[in-house]
Amino acid sequence: MTPLIAVLFAILQGATELFPVSSLGHVVIVPALLHWPIDQASPSFLPFVVMLHVGTATALLLYFWREWWAMLAGLLGRGEPGEVDAQRGLLLRLVVATLPAVLIGFALKKPIQHLFASPEIAAAFLIANGAVLIIGERLRRRRAGNGFGIGQLTLRDSLVIGLFQCLAFLPGLSRSGSAIVGGLTRGLDHEAAARFAFLMATPVIAGAAVIEVPHLLHHAAAARGMFGTALLAAVVAGVVAYLSTAFLMRYFRNHDRWALGPFAAYCALFGALSLILIPFGA
């Protein structure tokens, strides 16, 4: 993989990881359409992907550092009693929401792994992702009121959102999009749903990197050969992820009616075009 392709791949991953358009779907489809010289079976590819995850998780941690710092302070019992309880409650909700991804991820990783290499399957699921986003908006409109904040989530709500997030184990279904839709169905407004989804993403993305550490050590020699390129890509992915998060939080703050609509239309259009073009690019 050349440095240019590595940077382009990092930009693609860093942006689509947070936008509700499926990073996994894009990193399968786009290289196939553009004939990027990427060998996903290469021993050096896994370390490269792990570094991208590290960059993205770091960006999320930096953007939401105040929230994580407040939760840490609450866990340690520092602050006013009411604030301590609120922060401990938020941390517990995030733990509950993350558990389904951990448990289901281990169970489904091998059975569905063969789907990850198919651009056609990813494109079909990308169209399905657009449908999921539209369904989420319709369900949101049926709920009374304007939506509430994270502090009003119950543990059951958190578990449901975590289960929605697990849809993203299928390539083409967005992790952030599924989690946001889960939040909307439980009554959150768009900004609160996005904030909770992005807070959930930090341990999930970091965990995805940690899980691959044994394989990373196994291919340590190959990793050393492209460490500089992988480090550059991690920085690029982190910067793009940070900017994407800032944009999306501002977007959802200012749009609480059909905010997922443009992303749904994009997914349907790009998925359909990909299904048409991929056979000609093979």
From Swiss-Prot:
Topology with respect to the bilayer: Multi-pass membrane protein
UniProt keyword Transmembrane, yes or no: yes
Subcellular location: Cell inner membrane
Membership in a protein family: Belongs to the UppP family.
InterPro entries: UppP
Cellular component GO terms held in the UniProt record: plasma membrane
Keywords, sorted A to Z: Antibiotic resistance, Cell inner membrane, Cell membrane, Cell shape, Cell wall biogenesis/degradation, Hydrolase, Membrane, Peptidoglycan synthesis, Transmembrane, Transmembrane helix
Record organism: Acidiphilium cryptum (strain JF-5)
Cell inner membrane as UniProt keyword: yes
Task performed by this protein: Catalyzes the dephosphorylation of undecaprenyl diphosphate (UPP). Confers resistance to bacitracin.
EC number: 3.6.1.27
GO biological process, one term: regulation of cell shape
Top-rank taxon: Bacteria
GO MF terms, alphabetically ordered: undecaprenyl-diphosphatase activity
TM helices/strands, residue ranges: 7-29, 45-65, 89-109, 115-135, 153-173, 196-216, 229-249, 258-278
Other facts: Bacitracin is thought to be involved in the inhibition of peptidoglycan synthesis by sequestering undecaprenyl diphosphate, thereby reducing the pool of lipid carrier available.
Pfam families in UniProt: BacA
Top EC class of this enzyme: hydrolase
Name of the protein described by the UniProt record: Undecaprenyl-diphosphatase
Reactions mediated catalytically: di-trans,octa-cis-undecaprenyl diphosphate + H2O = di-trans,octa-cis-undecaprenyl phosphate + phosphate + H(+)
